[in-house]
């Protein structure tokens, strides 16, 4: 056992005190005022601390029946923070088609729970079909059938029937994001658009095309409308 001289004890205490003062001090950012619950959950040092920020059992329930926002992500449902997942539940009206879109931070697992849904998905540029053209993957889904849209792939869903279709989508991120291809493409400058389309859209027509792009979440399919005797309108 080592023996420490009494004369060295004050020096040792001073040294330890200076080390303690120099050591990083924990600041509880998880309770910082003005931050959203999601932001505080992100700042929590451990998963255990995140649970303390969600003290009620109701914090772990997201009710798709009552919410106006059919997508659960870490903003709308903070309990998802750190899980790496999100979900959406939705209804596609008769003859409805979602905009061609992509999710920049997640793959989507899409399951039909009622009705019928046709899907089209375009993977990355170098994925070609047997003829050397861009491959387009098309599916015809019934109840309890699923497809996958890889992260960043262009895709759309169409209800070709006269009754609503319902589906559930799971995402591999708690912040999947969405990009709508047509409206974002035509947000570029006129010169870029004209050159991108090889001059097939004249400069004077670009604003007309921009204005024609629907702004709602889904659009109607003309052929289906005629079959079902429905009136065309954005939905």
What are these regions (language model features)?
Residues 1-25:
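Fungal secretory targeting signals
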Residues 17-89, 99, 213-235:
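A short, N-terminal "cap"/entry segment at the start of jelly-roll beta-barrel domains
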Residues 29-32, 130-137, 158-235:
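Double-stranded beta-helix
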Residues 88, 98-100, 108, 137:
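Short, conserved secondary-structure segments in the cores of folded domains
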Residues 94, 140-162, 171-172:
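Conserved metal-binding segment of the jelly-roll/cupin
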Residues 98-103, 158-159:
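Short histidine-centered beta-strand/loop micro-motifs
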């Amino acid at each position: 056992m080592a023996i420490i001289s009494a004369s060295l004890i004050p020096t040792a205490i001073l040294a330890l005190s200076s080390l303690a003062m120099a050591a990083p001090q924990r600041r509880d950012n998880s309770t910082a005022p003005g931050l959203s619950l999601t932001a505080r959950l992100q700042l929590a040092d451990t998963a255990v601390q995140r649970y303390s920020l969600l003290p009620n059992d109701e914090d772990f329930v997201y009710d798709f029946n009552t919410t106006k926002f059919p997508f659960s992500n870490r903003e709308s449902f903070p309990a998802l923070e750190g899980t790496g997942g999100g979900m959406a539940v939705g209804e596609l009206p008769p003859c409805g088609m979602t905009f061609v879109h992509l999710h920049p931070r997640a793959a989507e697992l899409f399951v039909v729970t009622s009705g019928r849904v046709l899907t089209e998905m375009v993977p990355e540029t170098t994925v070609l079909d047997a003829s050397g053209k861009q491959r387009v993957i098309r599916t015809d889904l019934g109840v309890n059938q699923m497809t996958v849209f890889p992260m960043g792939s262009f895709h759309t869903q169409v209800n070709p029937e006269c009754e609503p279709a319902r589906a559930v989508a799971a995402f591999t991120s708690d912040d999947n994001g969405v990009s709508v291809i047509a409206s974002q493409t035509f947000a570029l400058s006129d010169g870029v658009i004209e050159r991108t389309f090889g001059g097939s859209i004249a400069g004077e027509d670009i604003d007309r095309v921009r204005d024609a792009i629907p702004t709602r979440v889904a659009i109607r399919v003309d052929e289906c409308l005629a079959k079902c005797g429905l009136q065309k309108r954005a939905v």
